Regions:
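Sec/Tat signal peptide C-region and signal peptidase I cleavage site
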Residues: 5, 17-24
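Bacterial Sec-dependent N-terminal signal peptides
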Residues: 1-7
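Bacterial N-terminal signal peptides
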Residues: 9-16
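N-terminal small/polar-rich segments of proteins
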Residues: 24-130, 135, 139-192
Length: 192
């Protein structure tokens, strides 16, 4: 009987020690972190307070000369933020004009990206003559941001041309005198 009691006591002691050993912490542990990264596609023109510009022409002072366009405007900057999805390798920014002005070509050029941005910034298409159809002005945008505000992103240069100049489509004979004509330029960032 003594042997049985001793065997039972030793068994219970071994079980208790075993349970204690299993309940102790080890020298490593782990946990999970769930991360959410949103898809982002944002574009704007800066500085936003003064993004509406005025361009025009000066009448010739000598007979036989054409209209002279005002100096090009270089005050605006194209900013964007992009986090692409796995399914979409890159994004583009397109530009279009809502109203064609007879006899006038409106040119826009986006300079290479500069400023405080990072990531896979897009590449400029160079000089475009604006039309009612979407045209790609920036291509190859990956996950990137240009930085916000003036002096960040792509500097935009707007210039006017009367009639058909290099790369132009307007016809000089279509020009009509007008005090002011307003056209809206729209930029859109989208997946390829």
């Amino acid at each position: 009987m003594k042997k049985l009691k001793l065997t039972i006591a030793l068994s219970l002691f071994a079980t208790a020690v075993s349970v204690n050993l299993n309940a102790q912490d080890t020298n490593t542990d782990n946990h999970t972190i769930t991360i959410s990264i949103p898809e982002v596609a944002l574009v704007d023109i800066e500085p936003s307070a003064t993004k509406n510009i005025t361009l025009g022409f000066t009448a010739p002072t000598e007979a036989g000369n054409p209209l002279t366009p005002s100096a090009a405007n270089t005050t605006l900057w194209l900013n964007y933020s992009s986090i692409k999805s796995v399914a979409d390798p890159t994004r583009n920014v397109t530009v279009k004009l809502n109203a064609i002005i007879p006899g006038i070509d409106i040119h826009v050029t986006a300079a290479p990206a500069s400023g405080s941005g990072a990531g896979t910034l897009g590449t400029s298409a160079g000089l475009l003559t604006l039309s009612a159809a979407d045209q790609t002005i920036i291509s190859g945008i990956g996950s990137a941001y240009t930085g916000n505000g003036a002096n960040n992103g792509h500097n935009l240069t707007y210039a006017l041309a009367a009639g058909s100049g290099p790369g132009g489509v307007a016809v000089y004979s279509d020009l009509q005198a007008t005090a002011t004509t307003v056209a809206t330029v729209t930029y859109t960032i989208s997946d390829n």
